């Protein structure tokens, strides 16, 4: 099914075949970027970032510029009419006429879905509260495929803030749809994966899940370690954050029993949960992950805008 004109609010809107198409095209663009330098000439991307972002916003902007398009938008709600009380619906009704595609990040869960109800151009969810982050999921999938050559028969460990981590929630729900996946959840008891999400994944996909508070317990078994930071901005209590912020710090000592082809990933930004000494380990792929995010977003937007039909 064509992605032309379609919104992307939740990665589960995409079939496995569509996910494969986006990833395949993203890797093709990554290998041959010059072939795609002007495919979006005359196209405008609108960025609506009501919440701080470095990688997601700049990755989208870089992606559009690398395809010959242009970008307009805001990176702080305080510099937009939202500060004056303008509704999301009214903002979308206006910007819908200014751009060919809109990407929105918002602290409120469901805001991009609401926006999509008023837009005639494609809306992409750039992250909504602790809910979903579909293009980070695409970034994660292209990184896994690029390094493992497959997305199946893998044991994936998620570590850190599994309660509020929208990148974890999006990726978990999507990976659980692929064949023969196993998951390990590593977190403090205060930041465990939401029960409804765990139950949904188990019930709908019959996957094997293990929960633990110990980072090293399953290190020798896992194929992918997905680290996340403890998110200070999600806490209402400073004391609780201070108590939990150093729960997990990955260093070379903790990797001593890990597989030689372990894939260490992180959606970034990193605080202190991965020691800098790990950066030079060949298994550390989080900076490559951020780089590949540009190319998978190029692929997504090209397909949504209809400048490419499929790979």
UniProtKB/Swiss-Prot annotation:
Reaction(s) this enzyme catalyzes, per UniProt: carbamoyl phosphate + L-aspartate = N-carbamoyl-L-aspartate + phosphate + H(+)
Keyword vocabulary terms for this entry: Pyrimidine biosynthesis, Transferase
Biological or metabolic pathway of the protein: Pyrimidine metabolism; UMP biosynthesis via de novo pathway; (S)-dihydroorotate from bicarbonate: step 2/3
Residues holding L-aspartate: 84, 166, 229
InterPro entries, alphabetized: Asp/Orn_carbamoyltranf_P-bd, Asp/Orn_carbamoylTrfase, Asp/Orn_carbamoylTrfase_sf, Asp_carbamoyltransf, Asp_carbamoyltransf_Asp/Orn-bd
A GO molecular-function descriptor: amino acid binding
Pfam families for this protein: OTCace (PF00185), OTCace_N (PF02729)
Function as written in the Swiss-Prot or TrEMBL entry: Catalyzes the condensation of carbamoyl phosphate and aspartate to form carbamoyl aspartate and inorganic phosphate, the committed step in the de novo pyrimidine nucleotide biosynthesis pathway.
PROSITE patterns associated with the record: CARBAMOYLTRANSFERASE
Superkingdom of the source species: Bacteria
Subunit structure: Heterododecamer (2C3:3R2) of six catalytic PyrB chains organized as two trimers (C3), and six regulatory PyrI chains organized as three dimers (R2).
EC number: 2.1.3.2
Record GO biological process: 'de novo' pyrimidine nucleobase biosynthetic process; 'de novo' UMP biosynthetic process; amino acid metabolic process
Binding locations of carbamoyl phosphate: 55-56, 105, 133, 136, 268-269
Sequence similarity: Belongs to the aspartate/ornithine carbamoyltransferase superfamily. ATCase family.
Protein known as: Aspartate carbamoyltransferase catalytic subunit
Annotated organism of origin: Alkaliphilus metalliredigens (strain QYMF)
